[in-house]
Amino acid sequence: RRTILLTAAAMPMIGSKVFAATPNQGASTVYFSKDINAENFLAIYDRLRKDANLPEDRRLSGIKLHGDDVDTNRGMWEALLNHIPNSKFVECNYASIYPAGRGNTQGNIRAITAQGVDKNRLDILDRNNEYTEVPIKGGKELKSVSAPTALLKEYGCVAVTANFRIPSFAGFSGACKNVGIGLASGEGKTQVHGLGVRKDARFFRRLADASKGIHDAMDNRLLFINVVSNIHVDPLKGTKVRTGNLGIVGSLDLLAADQAAADLIYGLTPAEYNAYSLQEKIDRGFLQLEYLDEIKAGNRTYKLITL
């Protein structure tokens, strides 16, 4: 059973449950702010960057931008861009099976800059058509995945910032999807989607595998922040779901970041998430959490620190 370790300052409600503080050395740290604004967004980034203890170097800092979701909480993303020296918004091309529009670098640039993003502050990581096949330790469906070499070589840090979206092809779109698909190359995305682009358990396996491979290849240079706002979900038997603007969560642990975001909505234990039917777990995205845990891509146990 998962326990959430809390600071003495707060013991927040997570769904319909309150989790008591219990000693657990294996827990990952998750920072939480109930109020969704630029100040707290930046504060969580600063804490994560400090905790990551990344060396100062001349490489770029990236901020993951979702090219189809530029306007949601846009002011927060722009504030972070202005806050981080030598930073750019980063995005990758669509899957190679969709070569038009955002499926090629120039089309991607046109689509994003048409939404008002400064071309000089945007880096499409596929720009050089140079890719690295990164290995996936413990992958169940994939043993490697293609990622842009520019990401791996030119960036000292990337903040994987996501509007935690429901619904999504993956049930929800958070840290896992924004790494395993979002930071994969066009070919890498096609590897993850597979033949026929079917939303089935094997897709979730490949998504978890790719997330772990790219995360490991970046050697802990990824920071994860989920903005859980404007949430609308259908009722779920066994819990009282929460909707609306629920807060911001951030972690150096990919799985913990998504687990904490899901917990704000559903408030379940890992065993309770896992007990739902396969179809429910596919529809809700719970399989992301289960499969990431199985391949040791992160921790479902976390210490929640309220800022």
Residue spans for each PLM region:
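Extended, low-polarity segments enriched in aliphatic/aromatic residues
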Residues: 23-307
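N-terminal export signals
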Residues: 2-21
